[in-house]
Amino acid sequence: MPISYNKASVVVSLQSIIANYRRIRTVAQRPMPVIKSDAYGHGLEAVGMALEAEGARECAVGTVGEGAKLRKAGFGADIVALLGALDREDAQLAASSGIIPTVLDIAGLERLAAQGTTERPVRVALKFDTGMARLGFTEHDVSALCERLRTLPSVRPVMAVSHLAVADDPTQSAFTMAQGAAFARIMAGLRSNFPDIMGSLSNSAATLAHPQLHWDVQRPGIALYGSNPLRGTALARHGEGLLPAMSVSVPVLQVHPLPAGRSISYGRTYTATKDATVAIIAAGYADNYSRALSGRGVAVAGGRRVPVLGRVCMQTTAIDVTDVPGIATGDRVWLLGGPGPATVSADELADLWGTISYEVLCLLGMNPRRHDDSVE
């Protein structure tokens, strides 16, 4: 549920997302933007509509409900629901909204078949497990699956999808290529029965760095939002030039001195070693600013990097503003992004947080949000 009770401000740059999409288009023939989980916190409807206007032929969401919400907003291109139709209500909604759900098993296939007709079959995407050990059919199911599909004219398979486990790690390229080989065998079996079925295997990392795994449709996700999935690896150059799309700022509640020898916040985990000035900002773990950032986080105040002091509280956090002249109550402090070279990236914040940029964006993006709609 979106957070609505605080004074945080999330600003999403649609222009940056479109720039990243264009960057991806230079290496991918048919990228299907992944906008699940509220577009990784960036706003499902706004991001989806901007990408459709830019020429995206389809987008991928997580649930059928997300897809229906996007369709209701006026999205006219194809929508693939990656988690599939989880129950009968989902199956009905997918059929009525023209959403393409993934199918994970025979029961799900039959659930969807009940919603279609021979004249108006429900389009589906077949989900295969090639190494994630998570969801879907296996390579050994292809023959029996095709036999069952031939008896169900009320469904039409239009795509087969699988997901790569370590495409972002070149030290495990053998596993990635093994997944690719398994998917190739799956596609051969499917196309002997359904010649027009499309294949989709590549995530952001594979889209950027492994063209041999592109197949017909590519599924960039985190790269759309400015995070390099290959950061810190020998393949990092393939993800350079992506633009961050989210910034998060909060107001200063109070500025006061912290004399040498005085502690601050719960647990007294920080004691000033010299006279300092602190600002208490309106952000805490209830605002999805993690308690793991206690004594580790950084923020941008007055154009400068400043450290978090002591423990992050439920709705407040202390920062050291000793070297930020003139800072006052009501000024904005950036938890993510921020003006000038001091900006904090999602990847950097994730490192401090002990997580990944995906979680940072999904969680902070739940705060009050607006979009910069200027797309050139």
Curated annotation (Swiss-Prot):
A GO biological-process term: D-alanine biosynthetic process
EC number in record: 5.1.1.1
Cofactor: pyridoxal 5'-phosphate
Any one GO MF annotation of this record: alanine racemase activity
Active site: 36, 266
Listed transmembrane segments: none
InterPro entries referenced in this protein's UniProt entry, alphabetically: Ala_racemase, Ala_racemase/Decarboxylase_C, Ala_racemase_C, Ala_racemase_N, Ala_racemase_pyridoxalP-BS, PLP-binding_barrel
Cellular component, GO annotation: cytosol
Keywords: Isomerase, Pyridoxal phosphate
Record's catalysed reaction(s): L-alanine = D-alanine
Pfam families: Ala_racemase_C, Ala_racemase_N
Record keyword RNA-binding present: no
Residues involved in substrate binding: 134, 314
Modification type N6-(pyridoxal phosphate)lysine: residues: 36
Pathway involvement of the protein, from the record: Amino-acid biosynthesis; D-alanine biosynthesis; D-alanine from L-alanine: step 1/1
Role played: Catalyzes the interconversion of L-alanine and D-alanine. May also act on other amino acids.
Similarity comment: family membership: Belongs to the alanine racemase family.
HAMAP family registered for this protein in UniProt: Ala_racemase
Protein name (database record): Alanine racemase
Species per Swiss-Prot/TrEMBL record: Nitratidesulfovibrio vulgaris (strain DP4)
